[in-house]
Curated annotation (Swiss-Prot):
One biological process term in Gene Ontology: response to retinoic acid
Listed name of the protein: P3 protein
Organism encoding this protein: Mus musculus
InterPro entries named in the record: BilAc:Na_symport/Acr3, Bilac:Na_transpt, Na+/solute_symporter_sf
Subcellular location: Membrane
UniProt entry tagged with the keyword Zinc: no
Length: 473
């Protein structure tokens, strides 16, 4: 049984009152002890409807409830208890020394264990485990029933099948403070989705097939971009997650961000910084299509290496679905330009006035997102997010220098690796994870997007000033 502390009227605890197999004065005393252990003398039970009757235990000494349930819901940022029954001989009849129960939470960001106390009642014994929940997520439990009176200590039983699912509150503090609904519920978002789809289709109409053919014949820039985007940058995210010991949700957000394809206006920055614009558009198209394979793969690999998969479900299928939502209209645009060039030109003309609407809507949603996502942001992820675009720019330029590419292509490769589609990463996280987990993980792409835009604008301004001070004759 899992019980939460709260103020208010008390509720009957199944299994420790008159209905759960505990009778008489000793049973009432057991119930009283549980109430004393919780301030205010009031409890709210978790959503699982279970009993602490010592019945079905599937051949185990330890059980929670009747043994038929192994996953229990618990609210976020709360304190409470877990009642674990024990049928170990000696503890149930009080004739032998009491064993000791060790309880370990395998994700302390989601759930921490405060204390473990042994209890007895007329029909058996068990343990009361004090818990404190943090972020929403799944916290597996590791139970070890030990007999320390033996030499060496005897491991009586070990269980790893129980877990506590910490669920987010219905109303987040940030939403209550700002009187705003969550940005994912904003109708503007749903109004912009068709425009985003058409905009991506029009982007595909800008891809020059001749440039794509040239890239296939001389694939050095394309290969360097793919190498930087899907090998070097995800590995950098992995290193930063290790060095700064980022929480698992943040680590996942950073991995997905650094595994994202080029985008975020990279071809515009190529134009402003003297890069090869047609190459930039083609590289963005190729990396977006390639991301449908590479991004889920790198997310799965690094999630395993960082043990994220143990406590946080990484929804690879949803990530892939979000990528396809972007890749399919871009590919459709390429086909339209090839087969229907006049319609392609018309589409480009039609989307131009709506681009301004997309820009305004994007700025509004970005502000609205920041209200939720940046609540409680900490320094480590800010520092890491600030370095990601800079490292990408340096990696891309260094790789291009190694192959002695022309200056314009060097700048394009550098920008394609450094300016990743962080907003795509943010969308994948928001559509794939539960709300609180998604908002927490989204701190990484949001900060990377802010940092990347600021740093690229600084480069544009710097080059503009340089061109004025040192004009080319």
């Amino acid at each position: 049984m899992v019980v939460k502390k709260s103020r208010g009227s008390s509720q009957q605890l199944p299994g420790l009152g008159g209905q759960g197999g505990c009778t008489g004065f000793v049973g009432m005393l057991g119930t009283a002890l549980l109430f004393i252990s919780l301030p205010w003398g009031a409890q709210v039970m978790a959503s699982a409807n279970i009993s602490t009757a010592l019945g079905h235990t599937s051949g185990h000494y330890l059980s929670i409830g009747d043994g038929s349930v192994t996953e229990f819901d618990f609210p976020e940022k709360s304190e409470g208890i877990i009642v674990i029954s024990s049928q170990y001989t000696g503890q149930t009849n009080g004739t032998g020394p009491s064993p000791i129960l060790k309880v370990i939470s395998l994700d302390t960001e989601v759930l921490t264990i405060k204390n473990v106390s042994a209890i007895t009642w007329s029909s058996g014994g068990g343990f009361v485990v004090g818990i404190h929940s943090g972020l929403a997520g799944l916290a597996p439990l590791h139970l070890q029933l030990m007999d320390f009176y033996e030499a060496p200590p005897l491991l009586i039983e070990e269980r790893r099948d129980f877990c506590i699912r910490v669920s987010p509150a219905e109303d987040l503090p940030s939403a209550l403070n700002t009187n705003l609904g969550h940005f994912s519920e904003n109708p503007i978002l749903y109004l912009l989705l068709p425009l985003i789809f058409v905009n991506k289709c029009s982007f595909g109409c800008k891809v020059e097939l001749e440039v794509l053919k040239e890239l296939l014949q001389s694939p050095q820039p394309m290969l360097l971009g793919l190498l930087g985007q899907f090998l070097v940058m995800p590995f950098y995210a992995f290193l930063m997650a290790k060095v700064f010991m980022l929480p698992k949700a943040l680590a996942l957000g950073l991995i997905i961000t650094c595994s994202s394809p080029g985008g975020g206006g990279s071809y515009l920055f190529s134009l402003l910084l003297g890069g090869d614009v047609t190459l930039a558009i083609s590289m963005t198209f190729i990396s977006t299509v390639a991301a449908t394979g590479f991004l889920p793969l790198s997310s799965a690999i690094y999630s395993y290496l960082l043990s994220i998969h143990e406590t946080l479900h990484v929804p690879i299928s949803k990530i892939l679905g979000t990528l396809l939502f972007i890749a399919i209209p871009i590919a459709a645009g390429v086909v339209i330009k090839s087969k229907l060039p006049k319609f392609s030109e018309l589409l480009l003309q039609v989307i131009k006035p709506f681009s301004f609407i997309l820009l305004l809507g994007g700025l509004f949603l970005a502000y609205h997102m920041g209200v939720f996502i940046l609540v409680g942001v900490r320094l480590p992820i800010v520092l890491v997010g600030f370095t990601v675009p800079l490292v990408g720019l340096l990696v891309g330029y260094s790789l291009a220098i190694c192959l002695k590419l022309p200056v314009a292509q060097r700048r394009t490769v550098s920008i394609e690796v450094g300016v990743q589609n962080s907003l795509l990463a943010l969308a994948m996280l928001q559509l794939s994870l539960r709300r609180l987990q998604a908002d927490y993980a989204s701190q990484a792409p949001f900060i990377v997007a802010l940092s990347g835009t600021s740093e690229m604008l600084a480069l544009v301004i710097g080059q503009f000033i340089y061109s004025i001070l040192f004009p080319v004759p």
